[in-house]
């Protein structure tokens, strides 16, 4: 009966106690010590630089807006000339790029046709060179055989004459 009153070992829950769990409120989120001297020097150095860059960005924005305000009426006044000129220039650039693309297409087609003819005849540069080497080897072999037979026949004739003289 004593076992029923005591909790079983697998039902024991352990809750570790953290000493600074909820103490301090917002202060616990902040670091305990202040910034280091290198961090302070970095901030002191970067503040004027970032301020200068921000000022330059603002000046650039104002200059762009003023330029747009001045140029818009000029574009409206000269649009009967500028629009056809822009269309003409765009057409010329497109024609130039198209002619280059057609030239490359023609060259690649010609290369493909030549390669297909080479494959049809079976004589590519490598096959032609191999065949030439094989023919040269056969020619040298035949000439060597003929020279050996000539030496043999000369030796036989010399041997007959040597035996006839003695």
Swiss-Prot record:
Q: Transmembrane segments in this chain: where?
A: 40-60, 73-93, 94-114
Q: Where is the signal peptide?
A: none
GO biological process entries: lipid droplet organization; lipid storage; response to freezing; seed maturation; seed oilbody biogenesis
Report where it is expressed, by tissue.
Expressed in seeds (at protein level).
Entry keyword annotation includes Transmembrane helix: yes
Q: How does it sit in the membrane?
A: Multi-pass membrane protein
Q: InterPro entries attached here?
A: Oleosin
Q: Which domain of life is it from?
A: Eukaryota
Which is one Gene Ontology cellular component term of this protein? membrane
- In this chain, the stretch annotated as Disordered covers 1-27
Q: Which residues carry this modification: N-acetylalanine?
A: 2
Q: Which UniProt keywords apply?
A: Acetylation, Allergen, Lipid droplet, Membrane, Transmembrane, Transmembrane helix
In this record, what's one Pfam family? Oleosin
- Motif Proline-knot covers 73-84
Cell compartment(s), UniProt: Lipid droplet; Membrane
Q: What does this protein do?
A: May have a structural role to stabilize the lipid body during desiccation of the seed by preventing coalescence of the oil. Probably interacts with both lipid and phospholipid moieties of lipid bodies. May also provide recognition signals for specific lipase anchorage in lipolysis during seedling growth.
Q: What is known of its domains?
A: The proline-knot motif may be involved in the targeting to oil bodies.
Give the protein family.
Belongs to the oleosin family.
**Listed name of the protein:** Oleosin H1
Q: What is the lineage of its organism?
A: Eukaryota, Viridiplantae, Streptophyta, Embryophyta, Tracheophyta
């Amino acid at each position: 009966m004593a076992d029923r009153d005591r909790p079983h070992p697998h039902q024991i829950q352990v809750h570790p106690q953290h000493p600074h769990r909820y103490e301090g409120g917002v202060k616990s989120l902040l670091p305990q010590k202040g910034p280091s001297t290198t961090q302070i020097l970095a901030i002191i150095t970067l503040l004027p630089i970032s301020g200068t860059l921000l000022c330059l960005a603002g000046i650039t924005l104002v200059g762009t807006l003023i330029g747009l305000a001045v140029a818009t009426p000029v574009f409206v006044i000269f649009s009967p000339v500028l629009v056809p000129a822009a269309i003409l220039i765009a057409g010329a650039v497109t024609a130039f790029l198209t002619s280059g693309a057609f030239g490359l297409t023609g060259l690649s087609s010609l290369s493909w046709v030549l390669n297909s003819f080479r494959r049809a005849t079976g004589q590519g540069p490598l096959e032609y060179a191999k065949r030439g080497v094989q023919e040269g080897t056969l020619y040298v072999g035949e000439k060597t055989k003929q020279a050996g037979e000539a030496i043999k026949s000369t030796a036989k004739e010399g041997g007959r004459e040597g035996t006839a003289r003695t």
